[in-house]
Amino acid sequence: MALTISISCFSSYFVSLLLLVLSSFSFVCFSLSTVSISHISNQTLVCALNNHSYLQCSSFPLNSIPFSLTGNLRNRRFSGVVSGNGFVCGLISRLDSNTSTLLCWRFSVDGTNMLHKRIYHGPELEELEAGNFRICGVERVSRRLRCWQPYYLPRPDNYRSIALGDNFFCGLSQPPGMISCEGIAKVPSGDHYIAIAAGSRQACAITVDNDVECWGQTQSLPREKFLALAVGEDRGCGVRWSNGTVVCWGNNNNFSLPQTLKDIHFTSIYAKGPMFCGVATRNYTLICWGNENFKSGVFTPFQGLISQVVMPGPCRRECPYRPLSGSQSLCGNELMICDLKRNDGEFPDTRAQNSKNKTWSRRNIAFLVVGCVGTFSLLLVISFLIFKSHCRCRVHDSGRLDDTRTIDIPKLEKRLCTLASLGNPGQLMEFSIDELALATDGFSVRFHLGIGSFGSVYQGVLSDGRHVAIKRAELTNPTLSGTTMRHRRADKDSAFVNELESMSRLNHKNLVRLLGFYEDTEERILVYEYMKNGSLADHLHNPQFDPLSWQTRLMIALDAARGIQYLHEFIVPPVIHRDIKSSNILLDATWTAKVSDFGLSQMGPTEEDDVSHLSLHAAGTLGYIDPEYYKFQQLTTKSDVYSFGVVLLELLSGHKAIHNNEDENPRNLVEYVVPYILLDEAHRILDQRIPPPTPYEIEAVAHVGYLAAECLMPCSRKRPSMVEVVSKLESALAACLTAPKTETVSRSNTY
């Protein structure tokens, strides 16, 4: 195991040198596709990049899934597309900045209710592949593997191509072409593979002889040589090496290519479930087969559209052999689509070529390895020591497609490997369970502070004397059913991952600091700095706590606003908290307020995304949720502004967001207080537990009331940004600390 780790770390430093020397062995195998197939219920959605690289989709039965792009995305050039059960994702790559953005659309069981979400923005992805439930990609420069939806992988590798099944992953390494898999047995050995593909429960690879080898739940294979493969559910198809036509097999020998397609030559083929699609070489039109409901066994998704031509492959910066004829005009920007044939008409990576270079390659590879080890031995030792722990990490799950969990994950992804590799300043510690148990006297009731949405919270003292707050998730409950328990566990895992990822990259005096974590199969624990004075909700709503003065309330409001402003304005992409409330604003020993609990947080859109919001199911706490977000499921930073407006009303009135009126009937704080503010009668709703504001405080209190009303505007576009909120609170606090001015407070922009 140690040897594997050191070689992996070593290769990350010298991969460019190795590739330069081994350029004779360049593989023409790509896992970035321009066609995708998605199934949900009895409906199918086929998407492809047309000859302008625009994303277009067609469903079967016709128009059963009303998928369409909006705004600037209609004319946005995509570099690839992948799909799975109920989702479609498009990759946008910017060559000028070497970055990629991955946008995903998820649709409901009936094919409606499209939800749009960006799940990645970072270093350029050169390879991208999706199974039915998850997505993985490979960065172009570092060859680092990234996956979305939790996925168990033992280590990052320098993958040239990847393939995903329902519960397994396979990768084809950089030359010399070895296959490694997780979640599937009987993986072939050797270093003579040039392409790889996966279906639901089986995977196949093409050798340098152009033979096919399959593993998993395999079917009998035709004795043919292949140029390209597509593997579906218990079936597969391949492009013949000899002439570019297609042959299919599987389904207990009951699956074959429709007779009408026997003589058609294909440039590329794709599969998902029972269905296959191929790009015809003659005119680059897309033809699909495999669905028993297709008329004559064939479906042409884009027939009748103005642009029936689809991209026959991904646009690349360079090709090992020649580019596909005419592809430069399709790609532009000096990009090209790679042809699998060399200029002499032969197919690459045949045994003849391999035999010709075999003696040279074996000898020179040996000299190369010995020379590199001798020359860079010192760097190798240093690299091994630095990355010894990190290279054992499992691959980072860079985001979630959504909150749905379709498989059982044995253990959460450890984030420290990726955080360290990105140079993250979070400095998170991974605590041991023994250390945390010792800090809390075995999680004793004496140290128990309360119960939150994530689980129980304990006060503890670490061995170095630091006072900490420890959140321990409650993953099991004998009173809940199995299904409910699985959903509950998934929610806890999601909150754990969100908190870990969000807090590890945030650093602000008005955000609670995450110190570290512990996780294993049965435990999810987060360790924070200890906040001695509890939460704002405690001091506003718990009679056992002394009420706060008006000046202290304004200072707390300003502190919390500055923390939220940092999330919205100083983090790229911005972080939307989604659960701003008084119980998530904590107070330290000096009464400095800090925002906490990032379990529901989401990364918001940036200007580069060409979208103004995220389409997500509403989440948060009743009474604080933005009505526009709740109704239209469109999340923006202004949703946090609304929630903060409710907190301001709590500070003014002392009431909870949802509380009982004089008749013991539930009452919404916004509906109760805002009308008084608009009538300039805010004095009627002020907290009666403390004396009325002094002449030095009345202007500031009125100012906060008007600001709260602005934050609670029904239309999110009319709400102030957190920059404006901070500015107005600073003015209010200044008014509170000095003699009142003669002019009155402005209510402009309020309703």
Swiss-Prot record:
Residues 1-31 form the signal peptide. ATP binds at residues 449-457, 471. Belongs to the protein kinase superfamily. Ser/Thr protein kinase family. The keyword Signal applies. One of its GO terms (molecular function) is protein homodimerization activity. The active site is at 579 (proton acceptor). It catalyses: L-seryl-[protein] + ATP = O-phospho-L-seryl-[protein] + ADP + H(+); L-threonyl-[protein] + ATP = O-phospho-L-threonyl-[protein] + ADP + H(+). Glycans are attached at residues 42, 51, 98, 243, 254, 283, 357. The gene is CCR4. Residues 388-751 are cytoplasmic. It is found in: Membrane. Residues 443-733 form the Protein kinase domain. Pfam families: Pkinase (PF00069). GO terms for cellular component: membrane. Expressed in roots, leaves, especially in trichomes, shoot apical meristems (SAM), and, to a lower extent, in floral buds. Residues 32-366 are extracellular. It is an enzyme of class 2 (transferase). Homodimer. The chain crosses the membrane at residues 367-387. InterPro entries: Kinase-like_dom_sf, Prot_kinase_dom, Protein_kinase_ATP_BS, RCC1/BLIP-II, Ser/Thr_kinase_AS. It comes from Arabidopsis thaliana. SMART domains: S_TKc. It is a single-pass type I membrane protein. This is Serine/threonine-protein kinase-like protein CCR4. Keywords: ATP-binding, Glycoprotein, Kinase, Membrane, Nucleotide-binding, Receptor, Serine/threonine-protein kinase, Signal, Transferase, Transmembrane, Transmembrane helix. Its EC number is 2.7.11.1.
